[in-house]
Amino acid sequence: MAQVEKRGGLLRKSSASKKPLKEKVVLMYDEIFMTEDPSKCSPRFWEELFLMKVNLEYLEGKLESLDGEELMKIKDNINCLFQHCIQALGEEHPIRVVNALQTLCALIRGVHQKNKSTSGFDIINMLMGFDKAELCMKNLMESLDSLLCAEGSESLKSLCLKLLLCLVTVTDNISQNTILEYVMINSIFEAILQILSHPPSRREHGYDAVVLLALLVNYRKYESVNPYIVKLSIVDDEATLNGMGLVIAQALSEYNRQYKDKEEEHQSGFFSALTNMVGSMFIADAHEKISVQTNEAILLALYEAVHLNRNFITVLAQSHPEMGLVTTPVSPAPTTPVTPLGTTPPSSDVISSVELPLDADVQTSNLLITFLKYSSIVMQDTKDEHRLHSGKLCLIILTCIAEDQYANAFLHDDNMNFRVNLHRMPMRHRKKAADKNLPCRPLVCAVLDLMVEFIVTHMMKEFPMDLYIRCIQVVHKLLCYQKKCRVRLHYTWRELWSALINLLKFLMSNETVLLAKHNIFTLALMIVNLFNMFITYGDTFLPTPSSYDELYYEIIRMHQSFDNLYSMVLRLSTNAGQWKEAASKVTHALVNIRAIINHFNPKIESYAAVNHISQLSEEQVLEVVRANYDTLTLKLQDGLDQYERYSEQHKEAAFFKELVRSISTNVRRNLAFHTLSQEVLLKEFSTIS
């Protein structure tokens, strides 16, 4: 026995002195990296190569290790490998196809990685050769299209989408990725739509398909005609649009669920008990610890669908059971891909068909509700750059929705009432609202709640001016619709008025600090004009005459804030400083608010003196207001119900370029080609002839 151990030891010692044996595929890669054509000595070289398990790390690493000159010496072999990969995609043997797809991924990534450090290095020439590029890419795109549309292997479809995502995201700025010109010419748009319109393929590949489409839409969108934009804008197939909506809703629901789970876990833990003991002193820190990474890729897809396709607006209101409440048996899938920005798409559709009988006991939801909940989480904390971008994109999407006539129709529909549990930022001075006490209301109430919540919770040193302006614009556009269509919305308008006045107070108390960074008068003017909208047209859209009385009560009650604002803008408009013009606009806009204050205040004081009351109740003030409307004179202000429509190209191009760059980087970082193990593939393709 001791002798056997000794022999074993000797064997180990001798083997340690030798170099580890290279696997055959690595030896074959080494032959490709020689200047000679590897098929000269081995006529079956390319045929054998695609039967070997791909070694992605070695192939990519080898490409990265060569300098530009060395790489150019083996260009013919690289071109040959690329062309044989494309040929292999047409093979009957699935293993060859899988290996060809993975090899293409490694080639594209490896050559692009090399390009970052080599100036004047042309990727198309290096991969395919200029003379063959057009035909190569045509054949590649046709093969991918066929594989995606075929009824074959789901694993192959998954790899095809990953190859396309790899192709699109190899450069941070996708508009500089010249290979995408061929993806524009040889469109795979219909293949993407087919995936989204069929429930089985949507369950497996919907997420990757939607992200891919969102990225392709953003290729040189401002410089040239992008066929994916044109085609997306005219899609009217209900199954396809609903499929896209479901994929987006599931990804956002998954985010909402993850956040809720972390929140509950956090609240039930030791830290929660500690914060309760010390009066929630550390509530901000506690909140930061339960943040979940945002999913900007899926949000971009939602934006493009809402912005480009008017038919998609109907999908926002498509009712279905709330995804978090419905459980469905999940069949084991061969892969669980890690998706960009840390969100894994649900492995099964909550809804298997467009039409679904609804259980009266199950809370119904829709894509818009899911999006509003997502927005309420993301918009809580805008200090982080990703959340700031996500918060901005949420407000841009809401802007597009608030401008759409059909969207407004269902937002304000009294027959479409929902209970929407928005997340509210933990704040020391208010109690957590009980979700069960929320009433069922038209969806516009939830949008307004979200805007009020944002206004109240972001008055801070690092003031998000851009987000505030967008928030007020959303409110204004909704009011314009209500005025135009005479919609009398039963909403707690007082909460909005109070939030707006508190925002004005914040702007005034932080005048010096804020003016160093922002033109606060733009925002102040918008707030004042919202009040002017209520004053001038409130009788056409406020729910009751008493609501209009309450508006006047709030203005009179908070008259000191409006007086202080007037003093501030008057001071700056009479000085010859940079804010003169901006401040004077606010001065003029305050004319009716000041008229109300100056008209009613003396009458209230007189009423108090006559009746020997030191402090009037709300009802007594309202009594004075109602008795003195007739003698109030107001000026008619033009343009209060007009607004500039949203335009991406002129104002938002820089934001979207940066956002797409960030998404591209994250998609590339999270692409997982190893989710398909060779064992799984061999099991799936066990019938290789």
From Swiss-Prot:
One BP annotation, GO: regulation of Golgi organization
Assembly, per entry: Interacts with PI4KB. Interacts with GBF1.
TM region(s), chain numbering: 520-538
Organism: Homo sapiens
Function: Involved in GBF1 recruitment, Golgi maintenance and protein secretion.
Tree of life domain: Eukaryota
Bilayer topology: Single-pass membrane protein
Family to which the UniProt record says this protein belongs: Belongs to the ARMH3 family.
UniProt-listed PANTHER family: ARMADILLO-LIKE HELICAL DOMAIN-CONTAINING PROTEIN 3
Protein's UniProt keywords contain Transmembrane helix: yes
Subcellular location(s) of the protein: Golgi apparatus membrane; Cytoplasm
GO cellular component: cytosol; Golgi membrane
Name the UniProt record assigns to this protein: Armadillo-like helical domain-containing protein 3
Ranges in a coiled coil: none
This protein's record includes keyword Metal-binding: no
Keyword field: Cytoplasm, Golgi apparatus, Membrane, Transmembrane, Transmembrane helix
UniProt cross-references to InterPro entries, sorted A to Z: ARM-type_fold, ARMD3-like, ARMH3_C
